[in-house]
Amino acid sequence: MADNMDFKDLMADEAEDIIEKDIARVNQASEDIDQENQSEVVDDTTENEDASEEVYEEDTASEDGSKEKKSFFKKKEKKDKKDEKIDELTDRLMRNMAEFENFRKRTEKEKTQMFEVGAKDIIERILPVIDNFERGLAAVSVEEKDSAFVQGIEKIYKQLVTTLEAAGVKQIEAAGKEFDPDFHNAVMHAEDEEYGENIVAEEFQKGYMYRETVVRHSMVKVVN
């Protein structure tokens, strides 16, 4: 179980590295566009200064206009390619982030399931100890109930039950409740006018739940 969790953590680290690299690519592409724009501003300024210092004839002005148009479309084409690259990297980044988020949720769910399976196994091993405490305390005579030994055993029992309750373990209600096969295990049926039909008349062994999962069904007698 520990090896599996280490592998999941390693995969999460690798996913984070991929996302960080994609973010760096997007930032680099943005910086390239800023530098290109700054270069265009410098070029335009230089061209304007040169134009103000010289006097061109009509044919020269026409030729310069043609060059400016070619330069404009060339710069626009470069900018469009950079925008496409940024869009491509941004899309890839968003996909990787979505995949990582799904991976993280799936990993957390698997960790929770693994923890609950392990906790349920431990609780199943503790329940017979609870049963023995209850049988022992039920067998104590009236004269012995006030003895220090019995009171000490009772305190240990209550402490154990309180600890389990704090961990999410709770007892299943049975006696006097309507029979529910999801929580109760009917081991005996009887006729009893005191109870209505399909009502639990007696509980032979307590049932327990861990959070929303049944650890042990209540062993009961049901009225027909």
Swiss-Prot record:
<comment type="function">
    <text>Participates actively in the response to hyperosmotic and heat shock by preventing the aggregation of stress-denatured proteins, in association with DnaK and GrpE. It is the nucleotide exchange factor for DnaK and may function as a thermosensor. Unfolded proteins bind initially to DnaJ; upon interaction with the DnaJ-bound protein, DnaK hydrolyzes its bound ATP, resulting in the formation of a stable complex. GrpE releases ADP from DnaK; ATP binding to DnaK triggers the release of the substrate protein, thus completing the reaction cycle.</text>
</comment>
<keyword id="KW-0346">Stress response</keyword>
<keyword id="KW-0143">Chaperone</keyword>
<comment type="subunit">
    <text>Homodimer.</text>
</comment>
<feature type="compositionally biased region" description="Acidic residues">
    <location>
        <begin position="31"/>
        <end position="62"/>
    </location>
</feature>
<dbReference type="Pfam" id="PF01025">
    <property type="entry name" value="GrpE"/>
</dbReference>
<protein>
    <recommendedName>
        <fullName>Protein GrpE</fullName>
    </recommendedName>
</protein>
<dbReference type="GO" id="GO:0051082">
    <property type="term" value="F:unfolded protein binding"/>
</dbReference>
<dbReference type="GO" id="GO:0005737">
    <property type="term" value="C:cytoplasm"/>
</dbReference>
<keyword id="KW-0963">Cytoplasm</keyword>
<dbReference type="GO" id="GO:0042803">
    <property type="term" value="F:protein homodimerization activity"/>
</dbReference>
<comment type="similarity">
    <text>Belongs to the GrpE family.</text>
</comment>
<dbReference type="GO" id="GO:0051087">
    <property type="term" value="F:protein-folding chaperone binding"/>
</dbReference>
<dbReference type="GO" id="GO:0000774">
    <property type="term" value="F:adenyl-nucleotide exchange factor activity"/>
</dbReference>
<dbReference type="GO" id="GO:0006457">
    <property type="term" value="P:protein folding"/>
</dbReference>
<feature type="region of interest" description="Disordered">
    <location>
        <begin position="27"/>
        <end position="77"/>
    </location>
</feature>
<dbReference type="InterPro" id="IPR000740">
    <property type="entry name" value="GrpE"/>
</dbReference>
<dbReference type="InterPro" id="IPR009012">
    <property type="entry name" value="GrpE_head"/>
</dbReference>
<dbReference type="InterPro" id="IPR013805">
    <property type="entry name" value="GrpE_coiled_coil"/>
</dbReference>
